[in-house]
Design a protein with these regions (language model features):
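C-terminal partner/receptor-binding element of secreted or periplasmic proteins
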Residues: 114-125
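Primarily extracytoplasmic ectodomains and periplasmic/lumenal surface modules that are beta-strand-rich
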Residues: 42, 50-53, 60-62, 107
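A low-complexity, Ser/Thr/Gly/Pro-enriched, surface-exposed linker/loop concept
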Residues: 21, 58-84
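Short beta-strand motif characteristic of blades in beta-propeller domains
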Residues: 41-48, 97-103
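Tandem-repeat architecture and repeat-register "anchor" residues
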Residues: 56-57, 111-112
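Short N-terminal segments immediately surrounding and downstream of signal-peptide cleavage
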Residues: 21-39
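Short, solvent-exposed interaction modules
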Residues: 73-107
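Sec-dependent N-terminal signal peptides
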Residues: 4-13, 17
């Protein structure tokens, strides 16, 4: 009986350890939020009030490899209803794509980060 109980405890702990937490699980009323990408050197910085997004890259190789570049500088709130936490990014299975959600109005955008010329933010209708 004791072995079965120990086995069940180990099994339940292993299930909990394998559970994945969604990227957006952390709730905050902050103006800016960093999102991890599958590339260890790259993050996406989101203005949670306006939906504006920047690609941020860091490096240990030197300053020429560190940069912050615009993905979308369009204020998607158009100046109305700007409140922290209005916009949030969600990972997709494609490492270069995220979904941007307007949590108040329900609008969505495809966000693609990458090299110059590959970056885009497209409204999903």
């Amino acid at each position: 009986m004791k072995r079965i109980l120990i086995f069940l405890m180990v099994l339940s702990i292993s299930f909990m350890a394998n559970a994945q937490t969604p990227v957006s699980a952390e709730q905050c009323d902050c103006n800016y939020k960093l999102y991890e990408t599958s590339n260890m050197w790259t993050f996406l910085k989101l203005d949670t009030r306006t939906g504006q997004i920047w690609q941020v890259q860091y490096s240990v190789e030197g300053p020429e490899y560190r940069f912050e570049t615009e993905l979308s500088t369009v204020d998607l709130s158009y100046g109305a209803n700007k409140k922290p936490g209005k916009y949030e990014l969600y990972k997709t299975q494609n490492i270069h794509n995220f979904i941007l959600l307007d949590k108040v109005e329900g609008k969505t955008w495809q966000v693609q980060w990458g090299k110059a010329g590959e970056r885009q933010v497209i409204r999903i209708y």
